[in-house]
Amino acid sequence: MRILVKLICFTILLFSRKSVYCKQHVIEGDILVHKSELLRNAVNRESRLWPNATIPYKIVASEWRENPWMLYLILDTMNKIEAQTCIRFVPRSDEKSFLVFNSNTSDCSSYIGRIGRPQPIYIGPRCAAVTVAHEIMHAIGFQHAHTRPDRDNFIEILWDNIKRKKQMNFEKANSLDYTTFTQFDFDSIMLYDPYTFSQNRKATLISKVPGIDIRRKSEKLGLSEMDVISINTLYKCDFNEKLRKY
């Protein structure tokens, strides 16, 4: 029912990627950041959270006519997040801060948290369902798990296997700029695929924990239980009502 309601009430937004953000950059493969902004403290700043855990959104309806399946994935992902957390996605009315789902790209990328103005989430035709969830979780306020300050206790970065120009994407965050809510989660959709940015088809990050491997993105079905706990903790949700796995 929620999907039908959102399909009926989504709003058409007609502007191009270039006209809105001519100074945006992509780091870590899919994180959008304005050149004047600091990335690492996004989660730690209250201003980057969505007030009342409510996220207004607009969908450029005309862009999805040739690929309605991607539109379904977006709406289905929002429904699943709502079922697990106190996050609510609502069609934008007059809010200044809102998400804009845009398909005019081959990329999958998003800003981290609320940036205080219309902000795009680019969902290209090659974005899988788990990638859509990954980008929306960025927009909710979460960074990549492989940059956690404590990551060296759980994973090893294989620098020799990483493309030289992409090695910056594996830099570790410092503890002042990165908030963690759970133990390291190998099932998180925010953890890099083990072959991300490989220059030789070998793994770029591996597990240090015996008996646990880093799964491919294609093997993940959606938010992990600890992803859900992290969202609920960040937004002070009611755990008793919202902690159920789908």
How does the language model describe each region?
Residues 2-7, 11-246:
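Zinc-dependent metalloendopeptidases
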